Regions:
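Intrinsically disordered, low-complexity segments that are common in secreted/host-exposed effector
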Residues: 2-4, 54, 168
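Short, surface-exposed binding/anchoring microloops in extracellular/periplasmic proteins
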Residues: 25-75
Length: 173
């Protein structure tokens, strides 16, 4: 009897580990929502600038976490989480990897606006470059940031890869 159940047990074992896999992963490359097949979000550049600045400020305040973290199994199955909002602009995060991920609020902000004091070219390459249409892209990680040398990254508890940031319209506005 045990030998006939072996394939079933293996399948169940694999299925129990599959909870962490996003079966509809999205690419890390920037996608602007004015591309064919996408829906422009009609958000404002002022709000995009505000949310990026707010995220930098929030992550720098004593007592606040320095990292935005998406743990498993909480963030599995392609779940999208609200990071912050301002008016019509909603910043969402989606875990597309199969590992728990954590990134600095600075890296999220830089992904949105190209960085504090960004050049026009840096802004154009960031989500800000999608304009009022909004868009999405993988977090651009500053691998030189010493915060990524903390034990949770060195020991493999977290990766700094696999989080997609989306700028979309706040459905409540």
């Amino acid at each position: 009897m045990l030998s006939t159940m072996k394939p079933l047990l293996v399948a169940l074992g694999l299925a129990s580990q599959a909870y962490a896999i996003c079966y509809a992963p999205e690419p890390a490359r920037r996608i602007c929502y004015d591309e064919p097949g996408a829906t422009p979000q009609n958000i404002t550049l002022q709000e995009i600038t505000y949310v990026a600045g707010y995220l930098r400020y929030y992550g720098s305040q004593p007592g606040n976490p320095q990292f935005y973290t998406m743990n498993l199994p909480d963030a599995d199955n392609c779940g999208e989480w609200q990071v912050t909002t301002k008016g019509s602009t909603w910043v969402m995060a989606k875990l597309v990897g199969d590992e728990a991920a954590s990134v600095t609020f600075d890296d999220i902000a830089n992904t949105i606006d190209g960085g504090a004091g960004a050049t026009p070219e840096q802004k154009a390459a960031a989500l800000y470059g999608c304009g009022t249409a909004g868009g999405q892209m993988g977090v651009v990680v500053n691998a030189e940031d010493p915060r990524y040398q903390q034990p949770q990254f060195v020991n493999g508890t977290y990766t700094n890869q696999g989080i997609i940031i989306k700028l979309v319209r706040n459905p409540g506005v």
